[in-house]
């Protein structure tokens, strides 16, 4: 029986991975590894760190069934060595013919690697879109796109970013947006197809609380929260947010504008990428005989 081989690329530097481990319990790449293996035990994962110096110890990129790029604390427009290494890696990934997926930084990286542009948020009242992206709407193209299968046409979702896509590359189509930002794209570039989202469908409330704590000082500095205590209060409230949970009146302030009753906690776009892009591509590419069991 065949097993999918997915390469997970952590977008963070070594120092930032250590910071996430302190506040969340693990680096983002480990979160995605657990998510994929919990979804289906037939998935084999490898983790790579393209921001780090030195050669990447991976198979040829065309040997993988999928390449998944996590979020990151980095800013793609800064000419840091780790950023430049990741752009080069993403360009090679596009040339490999392997299906790609990116979350937050992962989407921004793909946009830049394919010739687009990402800059700091230009929205006056939203220097950092967190803890939620509200009012996300599927575009006419996105409403029929398999990446968003089972999504409602409008939704709220966990989010954490201070940069935005300002120019799309050729071959890119927006599949979701809200009033402030491009929220999801498909990019056909080189030999590969990329699906990506600006928001974080992989996070639980507990995970998002850890993200807030990890970036607490910067959230106060950029005006997203008034004090570190305000960040902590928000983190405590969001850590308890899960399907069916009742939000106390004192915590409602942290969920302003969020439809908590219809909030979708499943990582739909990632699972749809596996089912609707990775698996069909692998069957064509490697001549699979149908051994994959979908959940």
Swiss-Prot record:
What does the protein in this record do?
Involved in the degradation of isopropylamine, which is a constituent of the herbicides atrazine. Catalyzes the hydrolysis of gamma-glutamyl-L-alaninol (GALO) to L-alaninol and L-glutamate. It can also uses gamma-glutamyl-isopropylamide, gamma-glutamyl-ethylamide, L-glutamine, and gamma-glutamyl-p-nitroanilide.
Report the gene knockout effect. Answer: Cells lacking this gene are unable to transform isopropylamine to L-alaninol.
The EC number on file is: 3.4.-.-
Q: What superkingdom does the record give?
A: Bacteria
Gene Ontology CC terms, in alphabetical order: cytosol
User: What does the record give under GO molecular function?
Assistant: hydrolase activity
- Pfam families recorded: GATase (PF00117)
Task: Spell out the protein name for this chain.
Answer: Gamma-glutamyl-L-1-hydroxyisopropylamide hydrolase
Q: What catalytic reaction does the record list?
A: gamma-L-glutamyl-L-alaninol + H2O = L-alaninol + L-glutamate
Q: Where is the Glutamine amidotransferase type-1 domain?
A: 5-221
Key words, A-Z: Hydrolase
Q: Does the keyword Hydrolase apply?
A: yes
Would the keyword Hydrolase turn up in this protein's UniProt record? Answer: yes
Gene symbol of the encoding locus: ipuF
- The residues responsible for catalysis, as annotated, are 104, 200, 202
């Amino acid at each position: 029986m065949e097993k999918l081989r997915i390469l997970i690329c952590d977008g963070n530097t070594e120092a930032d991975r250590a910071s996430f481990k302190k506040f969340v319990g693990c680096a983002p790449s480990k979160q995605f590894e657990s998510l994929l293996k919990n979804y289906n035990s037939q998935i084999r994962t490898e983790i790579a760190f393209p921001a780090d110096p030195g050669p990447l110890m991976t198979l040829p990129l065309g040997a993988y069934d999928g390449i998944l790029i996590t979020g990151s604390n980095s800013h793609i427009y800064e000419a840091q060595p780790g950023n430049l290494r990741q752009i080069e890696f993403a360009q090679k990934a596009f040339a490999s013919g392997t299906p790609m997926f990116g979350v937050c930084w992962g989407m921004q990286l793909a946009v830049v690697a394919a010739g687009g542009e990402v800059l700091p948020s230009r929205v006056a009242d939203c220097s950092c879109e967190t803890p939620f992206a509200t009012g996300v709407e599927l575009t006419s193209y996105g409403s029929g796109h398999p990446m968003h299968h089972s999504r409602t046409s409008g939704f709220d979702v966990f989010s954490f970013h201070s940069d935005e896509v300002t120019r799309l590359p050729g071959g890119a189509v927006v599949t979701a947006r809200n009033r402030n930002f491009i929220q999801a794209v498909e990019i056909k570039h080189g030999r590969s197809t990329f699906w990506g989202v600006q928001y974080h469908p992989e996070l639980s409330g507990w995970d998002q609380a850890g993200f807030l704590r990890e970036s607490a000082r910067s959230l106060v500095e950029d005006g997203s929260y008034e004090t570190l205590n305000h960040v902590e209060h928000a983190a405590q409230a969001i850590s308890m947010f899960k399907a069916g949970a009742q939000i106390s009146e004192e915590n409602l302030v942290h969920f302003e504008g969020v439809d908590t009753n219809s909030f979708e906690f499943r990582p739909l776009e990632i699972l749809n990428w596996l089912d609707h892009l990775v698996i069909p591509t692998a069957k064509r590419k490697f001549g699979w005989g149908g051994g994959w069991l979908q959940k």
